[in-house]
Amino acid sequence: AKAADTKVDYVPGWPAIEQIDGNMTFGIGMKVEASKGNILGARLSDVTVVIPDFESHEEILLVKGLAQGPTSEFFRFLDQSPVGASIDRFTEGMKATGNGSLSLELDIPLRHSLDTKVRGDYRFVNNQLEPVSALPPLTQVNGRLQITEKSVQAQDITGRVFGGALKVQVNNVGDKVGVVATGTANIAEVSKHFAFPLTEHLSGSAAWKADISIRKRNADFVIESDLLGVSSPLPAPLNKIATAPLALRIERSAPEAMREQYRITLGQVAQGLILR
């Protein structure tokens, strides 16, 4: 049978697949093969929905599909599905500009859908992302994000921030999502966002590493750099030539009062605490 503008609301709690055009066949089970469809505004292609055996005591609904569309819709899919709760709403409120593609597979036991298995692979294509308000937007983002019913991981996401390139790894542990980022930063660009005291007197670029822990849309992070490539004309002990290393450590935490707290350590030279 032909399916035209059909809706498959496959299991409670998951966004429905709509506007399906394709073929439906019935036998001991059901199979829907669709050339197109829609899920939360994202275009679907090569969609397959299968119930292998209606009479099985463990009926399984298998859903496979490819989607292309705005990254913001992919984040909304995560938020509105049970995956969102498993990763502590990691993408809730995250802003995205640009498109991408999703390969998705769902194995849904119809009698106990809480045991649904998810395998998803999302590919960012030259996106701009705003993960959390404490950090500047990431631009020219490319790479892949893998999701399951319990996890989110990424090993090869690249982009730009603070005027330099960066590479990002993502992995959730328990109710926290951990992000490790490495890159280079232009001091002038850092000053535009953070406006720390004295940064307007510095010049140059340096490599950095950040360990970020995100929980309930709040980010704690530690940023470290040896400041090689950065120079300072300030009086001693804050003067520095670009070829001399000087360990910088910035720790950010948000107390219960939601005031941002930055603890800054500059080698053996200086320490400071900034509240915003």
Predicted regions and their residues:
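Extended amphipathic, helix-rich lipid-handling scaffolds
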Residues: 1-8, 24, 29, 54-117, ...
